[in-house]
Amino acid sequence: MSESQDLPGAIVNRIIKASLPEGVLCAKESRLAIAKAAKVWIHYLTAASIDFSSHSGRSTISPKDVFQAIEEIDFENFKPQLEEYLAALKSEKEKEKEKEKEKEKEKEKEKDSNKDDTKSKDENKSSKKSSSSSKDEK
């Protein structure tokens, strides 16, 4: 595990700070140890997840693989919280998709109304031209 695979220090520090009770500090060496432990745990969970995906004949790790791996490495107490997070994430993505669809519909309506405005302006211009040319003929 090279240094290029280290977790971002600022993020690790933010997580540690949020986890500590008020008034409790964490030594720099402790922060480094926590970051290294988190990195090892990520590698371990990833390897276990890969096992489940490859047994299913897939090369992509799915959430199902991660949940199975969590159970296998005896961290099933994390599973309910992660399932809630995944459900919330999916819900949020659906809402974003709906908002994008609404924006696209609004853009289409604007385009249509702009086309209608352009057509009516063109019709007005051509009717003015024809009325002015008929006046000229008189």
Swiss-Prot record:
GO terms under cellular component: CHRAC; epsilon DNA polymerase complex
Keyword Transmembrane (UniProt): no
Principal place of residence: nucleus
Quaternary structure and partners: Consists of three subunits: pole, pole2 and pole3.
Low complexity compositional bias, start-end: 129-138
Keyword DNA-binding listed: yes
Pfam family, one: CBFD_NFYB_HMF
GO MF term list: chromatin DNA binding; protein heterodimerization activity
Span list, region Disordered: 91-138
Role summary: Accessory component of the DNA polymerase epsilon complex. Participates in DNA repair and in chromosomal DNA replication. Forms a complex with CHRAC1 and binds naked DNA, which is then incorporated into chromatin, aided by the nucleosome-remodeling activity of iswi/snf2h and acf1.
Phylogenetic classification of the source organism: Eukaryota, Amoebozoa, Evosea, Eumycetozoa, Dictyostelia
Compositionally biased intervals (Basic and acidic residues): 91-126
Coiled coil start-end: 79-119
A GO biological-process term: heterochromatin formation
Protein name: DNA polymerase epsilon subunit 3
Subcellular compartments: Nucleus
Keyword terms of this UniProt record: Coiled coil, DNA-binding, Nucleus
